[in-house]
């Protein structure tokens, strides 16, 4: 069931936060998720990723936050241990309206799509963050495949930094839920300024 504003998605609760445009690598071994992946590849559809707030990734049920991200499979392989490995990429954000559990334990959600953020350039006061990201991605390597970097785009820079900086999952979730690129950069700049202040104090 799909409309311009709503859809039905299989949910994959995880202890991580997926951002639009971000990479996600998973090892798939539970039957419910093997079936989900098979269906997604057969129908060229995606699945929903949402941060767990109660429960576990493997086995049983898990409760999640309300805001998640659509993931679309872009590659798959058989891993050395024989399990299925998939690479997915985040697309658009959604808000969970209702969840039910199917007989195989798979959570299926009715979701409402969230609007994409309006494009905004990185404000001059946050240009240092774009440069920080550039240097970090040079160290990390091709984590984003053939995606062309957009160091002038406030949303792209903020989301990529939110993925690679050492933040708690709930902090990443807070950044995912922000709807404004420059506001996300302000959050990150404030956090980095606080950390630098603590580091300076520890050196005294």
Task: Mark where each language-model region is.
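N-terminal low-complexity, acidic/polar interaction/targeting segments
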Residues: 1-204
């Amino acid at each position: 069931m799909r409309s311009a504003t709503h859809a039905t998605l299989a949910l994959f609760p995880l202890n991580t936060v997926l951002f639009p445009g971000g990479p996600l690598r998973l090892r798939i071994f539970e039957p419910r998720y093997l079936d989900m992946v098979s269906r997604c590849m057969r129908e060229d559809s995606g699945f929903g990723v949402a941060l767990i707030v109660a429960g576990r990734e493997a086995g049983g049920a898990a409760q999640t936050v309300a805001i998640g991200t659509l993931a679309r499979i872009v590659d798959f392989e058989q891993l050395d241990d024989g399990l299925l490995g998939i690479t997915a990429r985040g697309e658009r954000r959604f808000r969970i309206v209702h969840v039910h559990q199917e007989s195989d334990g798979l959570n299926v959600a009715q979701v409402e799509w969230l609007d994409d953020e309006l494009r905004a350039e990185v404000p001059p006061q946050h240009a240092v963050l774009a440069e920080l990201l550039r240097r970090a991605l040079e160290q990390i390597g091709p984590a984003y495949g053939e995606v062309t970097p957009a160091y002038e785009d406030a949303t792209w820079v903020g989301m990529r930094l939110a993925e690679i900086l050492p933040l708690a999952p709930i902090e990443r979730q807070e950044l995912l839920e922000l709807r404004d690129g420059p506001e996300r950069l302000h959050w990150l700049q404030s956090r980095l300024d606080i950390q630098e202040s603590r580091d300076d104090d520890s050196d005294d």
